[in-house]
């Protein structure tokens, strides 16, 4: 198998309404603004998104962007920032994570800027990332894992053509020590 770092993966994904591209040096302010606006909503699901519990600073957002840029090049992770074409605004962050290159398979993850919810942007991005995984990584499956209580995320999975494979009961602990269930969805190339 070819070392993943040698794969020539496109660094831009275009959909009818969105541009997805890896984070770049200098994207920190836009990311910080979107995160700051969205923290109350994101923190409802700390069991799935533990990183949002930490203070989100301009510096930490810029560090995420620089690390994301490096990780994309090294193929350790494939993060993307999602921009609305019409207005040019950062509307979401999404990516292909925990890629098992030998299989190959990947997990799609995302969060949406609060002011951009309800527009179908995340569903559009998840479909595009799934197709990217099937076409460029030759993935045989793409997983989407979410907290069972995150109904909006479950709807994204279903609208994007993912099938619920199972619910892992008492799979995570939330910061308040409550047990949470995790939904495991998957999509396959023949469903793309």
Predicted feature descriptions by range:
Residues 23, 34, 53-60, 74:
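Generic, well-ordered alpha-helical segments
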Residues 29, 52-55, 69, 167:
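Intrinsically disordered, low-complexity regions
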Residues 1-30, 34-44, 79-192:
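Acyl-donor (CoA/ACP) binding surface of acyl/acetyltransferases
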Residues 41-66:
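Conserved GNAT-fold acetyl-CoA-binding loop/helix
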Residues 52-53, 66-81:
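A short helix-loop-beta-strand connector motif used in the catalytic cores of GNAT acetyltransferases and
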């Amino acid at each position: 198998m070819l070392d993943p770092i040698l794969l020539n993966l496109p660094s831009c994904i275009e959909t009818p309404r969105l541009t997805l591209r890896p984070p770049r040096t200098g994207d920190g302010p836009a990311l910080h603004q979107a995160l700051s606006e969205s923290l109350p909503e994101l923190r409802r699901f700390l069991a799935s998104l533990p990183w949002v519990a930490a203070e989100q600073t301009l510096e930490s957002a810029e560090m995420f962007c620089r690390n994301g840029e490096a990780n994309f090049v090294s193929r350790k992770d494939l993060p993307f920032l999602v921009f609305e074409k019409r207005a040019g605004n950062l509307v979401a962050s999404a990516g292909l994570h925990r890629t098992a290159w030998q299989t190959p398979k990947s997990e799609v993850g995302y969060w949406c800027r609060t002011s951009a919810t309800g527009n179908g942007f995340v569903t559009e991005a998840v479909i595009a990332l799934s197709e990217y995984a099937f076409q460029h990584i030759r993935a045989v499956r793409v997983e989407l894992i979410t907290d069972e209580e995150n109904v909006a995320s479950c709807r994204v999975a279903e609208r994007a053509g993912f099938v619920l494979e199972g619910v892992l009961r008492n799979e995570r602990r939330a910061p308040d020590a409550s047990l949470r269930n995790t939904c495991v969805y998957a999509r396959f190339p023949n469903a793309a």
